Amino acid sequence: MQLGRLIRVGVALSVLLLAKSDHAHAQYNGSIKNPPYTYEDPLPILGKKVAGRGIQFPLPWGVGLNYMFMKQPVDITNIKLGVNDSEMADMSGFIKIKSVQSKVHAANLRLDLWLLPFLNVYGMMNYIPKSTTSITLSEPFPLESGATQQVVGGGFGATAAFGFRGVWGTLDVNWTWNYAELVSGAVRTTLLTPRAGMEVKRWDKVALNLWIGAMAQFIGSETNGAIKLSDALGEPTGALVDKVNNWYGGLPPGQQAIFKPLVDRINSADPGSATIKYQLDKKVAQTWNMLIGGQLEINKYWFVRAEVGVIKRTSCLVGLNYRFGTPGF
């Protein structure tokens, strides 16, 4: 039975594509003074001037492919439901959600550019082949449910970078708009991610960087749409119908009048003729979590990185980045 699907359509789809500039630390490799060198590429702006001071920085263009798994709790409030053309009824006092858990497998393709020696800008496309939400209800009766859907979307962002005495830092912000199969309209997500790290080892052209950081996630609050009752519940069985009727029978007459259309449809032989309208608010249960990551610079063209998120929201990211100069230079 899928009663939880009436609610899970509003679960935040965190398409969590950590958009850290893959080579931000390279501009600020400590207090080592390198000799001035010739830089012909027109990008980044002011790149030639920076090169004249002996500061090394990455090739301006980059293409990256990332994969991420994320698991996090989500809070859902202000639940309203309606049947067909009936007015929406506030269910917040009747439906008590014990827990909502979101699991996401996501892929991200992005193109980035060092516009200035300290500023990276990028665009990205997101694909989530599997976003699973598990919901546990405690009232009006205990029930566990879950659903899986696909999500597509895209967005843009920017990363500011700085460094001092061998330590580098970045501050990244990005916005994505994601379209899920079971949600009306786009779900907007904003990620704010500061990081600080350093180069810990170098072997000729190969370098290893490690960092720590934090990520804040903000999602669009209100979610609404419609779903067929048959998709939400499946074919009602005797046990579920009994639970609904027992709950309905315990309501005072005024509240029974509000929910009578819904209960009548559940008790009918053809629940597929009814459509449930819904509206709810949602947010991530914890805005901030901690990040620990590392990047292996194979050469000036190829980079491999990995990052894990801990503390309530858990995540694992792996990525491959290829950098190149402006064509013709």
For the regions a protein language model found, what residue spans apply to each?
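Transmembrane beta-strands of outer-membrane beta-barrel pores
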Residues: Y67-P73, M125-S131, F162-G166, V173-E181, ...
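Outer-membrane beta-barrel transmembrane domain signature
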Residues: T176-N299
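Extracellular loop and loop/strand-boundary signature of outer-membrane beta-barrel proteins
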Residues: V50, S92-I97, S138-G146, N178-G185, ...
